[in-house]
Regions:
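Mixed-charge, Lys/Arg-enriched low-complexity segments
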Residues: 60-105
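Compositionally biased, low-complexity repeat tracts
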Residues: 8, 17, 37, 52, ...
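Generic detection of short hydrophobic beta-strand segments and adjacent strand-loop junctions
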Residues: 17-19, 55-58, 97
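Feature targets compositionally biased, intrinsically disordered low-complexity regions
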Residues: 11, 20, 40, 55, ...
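A short, exposed loop/beta-hairpin motif centered on an aromatic-Gly-Thr core
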Residues: 47-63
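N-terminal segment of the canonical double-stranded RNA-binding domain
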Residues: 1-45, 100-104
């Protein structure tokens, strides 16, 4: 990973978020979400067992993570929430506020 400050970094991993909730088999899970800067903005990726889900590019990290959660919900994941755990190489010590996402009807 580059040691450039995030504001100067053109592409690559810029943040790691944590996503947790309940999978389609009704089991609790948590995984790391990798947020990358791309030429078009930000994209995110998460892997869960054999499933890999990626967002499209968005202008904000919040929109990117939200799309990723919505895609997981489309596969049957519920009670989802996320928070940032790393900004660049800096660990946020689990002090960031959780963002809860409403389940789909």
């Amino acid at each position: 990973m580059s040691t450039l400050p995030l504001m100067f970094k053109k592409e690559g991993l810029v943040e790691k978020h944590q996503v947790e909730g309940v999978d389609p088999s009704d089991r609790y899970f948590n995984r790391a979400v990798l947020v990358n800067r791309t030429t078009a903005g930000y994209s995110a990726k998460v892997m869960y067992e054999a499933l890999t889900v990626e967002s499209g590019s968005h202008s904000t990290i919040a929109a990117t993570v939200k799309e990723l959660v919505e895609k997981l919900q489309g596969f049957g994941f519920t009670r989802m929430r996320t928070r940032a755990n790393f900004k660049g190489m800096r660990y946020l010590a689990e002090k960031e506020t959780w963002i809860d996402y409403n389940d789909r009807p």
